[in-house]
Regions:
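A glycine- and small-residue-enriched flexible loop/hinge signal that marks low-structured segments
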Residues: 2-58, 62, 66-341, 352, ...
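C-terminal hydrophobic structural anchor segments
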Residues: 346-369
Length: 369
């Protein structure tokens, strides 16, 4: 039998390269807001809307509610992707009922005309909800997500395709809303920035903070004072909105490993309540707030957030601890999509492990780990 010999070099191309692990986009913001006078086409109720250039749509955000101030605060810090869910403003819907039918003011003849059942088995009508109900949302009778739950479907929406990683409901963040946002954040591997609702002084904020222990949360106190071009006056703007914008800017410029603290906030004039701070003072308001895991605001070459902690006091005590864990988990997991359901061969296992090692080495080299 003859033999065929080749005296040279053969080159074969292969596409079976090791899987590259890329960082997920951690700078996408998700905001729940009210604005009954906003453009209804651009901002439909209870549906996520993607904004790629926030400054271009400020004129359509209305002047009522919280939407304009939230978007203005973000736009002053960064140009990034923002997913907005607009919800009804309860103050313009009338007071919520507490057990009396919405026809309780009608005469008996009118009740009969409208076919109202006044028997003991009749269910009362609740035409209006509280603001917390609108903001938190859930699912309606048709199975559609409403309120903050609409953020869960943003990534699967053909018109959006992004997952919010920084979420807030500026100006609407009551205790119930903040706790619900943390539930959404856990599902999305996102991080929540929220104010200390209705707290007028440091002691109030410290008392309020005792109600939380979520690792996906940073509590902020007080709020900012900024100029409102719509009204022509200096007004209170929610700190949570600025935190979202600044967080996205830091992610763009430095990375998710850098905390929110000690970075100048753009285009603010003051703070809504006085805070005593001195760099070397251990008994200052700022240090007392920080000791209770509340991020405050100081004035030093401009205004800056001051504080790094979450209300979780055992493992994920810092904002960057939580966000690093989130980004690493999602970056590694998303890169393995093609290997799911593939044969568990030694080559595939080696590919997965080598890609993870290479990614971790790269993060250490770049100073992110």
């Amino acid at each position: 039998m003859s033999e065929t010999r080749f005296h040279g070099a053969r080159v074969r191309e292969s596409t079976g390269l090791a899987t590259a692990i890329n960082d997920v986009d951690s700078s996408v913001i998700g905001i729940v807001a009210t604005a009954d006078d906003a453009d209804e086409t651009l901002f439909p109720l209870n549906k996520p809307t993607l904004l790629t250039r926030v400054s271009d749509v400020l004129g359509k955000a209305g002047t009522k509610g919280t939407l304009y101030k939230s978007l203005k605060a973000v736009a002053d810090q960064v140009s990034t992707k923002v997913i907005v869910v607009r919800v009804p403003d309860a103050s313009s819907q009338g007071a919520p009922d507490t057990g009396v039918t919405s026809f309780g003011h009608l005469d008996p003849e009118d009740r009969a005309f409208f076919g109202i059942d006044e028997s003991e088995d009749a269910h009362p009508v609740y035409p209006h909800k509280t603001q917390d109900q609108y903001v938190i949302g859930g699912t309606d009778g048709d199975g559609n997500y409403t309120g903050m739950y609409a953020l869960l479907i943003a990534e699967q929406d053909d018109a959006i395709g992004y997952r919010p990683r920084i979420i807030a409901a500026p100006g609407l963040d009551t205790e119930a809303v903040t706790k619900s946002l943390c539930v959404i954040a856990e599902k999305l591997r996102a991080f929540v920035y929220a104010g200390c609702h209705n707290c007028k002084k440091p002691a109030d904020a410290i008392s309020y903070r005792a109600r939380f222990n979520e690792r996906e949360l940073m509590l902020l106190w007080p709020d900012f004072i900024a100029y409102n071009p719509k009204s022509g006056a200096n007004e209170v703007f929610p700190a949570a909105a600025y935190a979202c914008g600044l967080r996205a800017r830091i992610d763009h410029e430095q990375g998710w490993h850098k905390s929110l603290s000690n970075v100048p906030v753009t285009n603010v004039l003051g703070i809504s309540s006085p805070v005593f701070w001195s760099l070397q003072s251990e008994d200052s308001d700022a240090n007392n707030l920080n000791n209770k895991e509340i991020t405050t605001i100081i004035r030093r070459n401009g205004f800056r957030f001051w504080g790094n902690r979450t209300p979780e006091t055992k493992a994920y005590i810092f904002e960057v601890y939580t966000r690093t864990a989130q980004v690493l988990a999602d970056s590694v997991a998303e890169a393995q999509f093609e290997t799911i359901d593939a044969p568990l061969t030694p080559a595939n296992v080696k590919d997965v492990l080598s890609a993870i090692r290479a990614k971790l080495d790269a993060l250490v080299t770049s100073g992110r780990l």
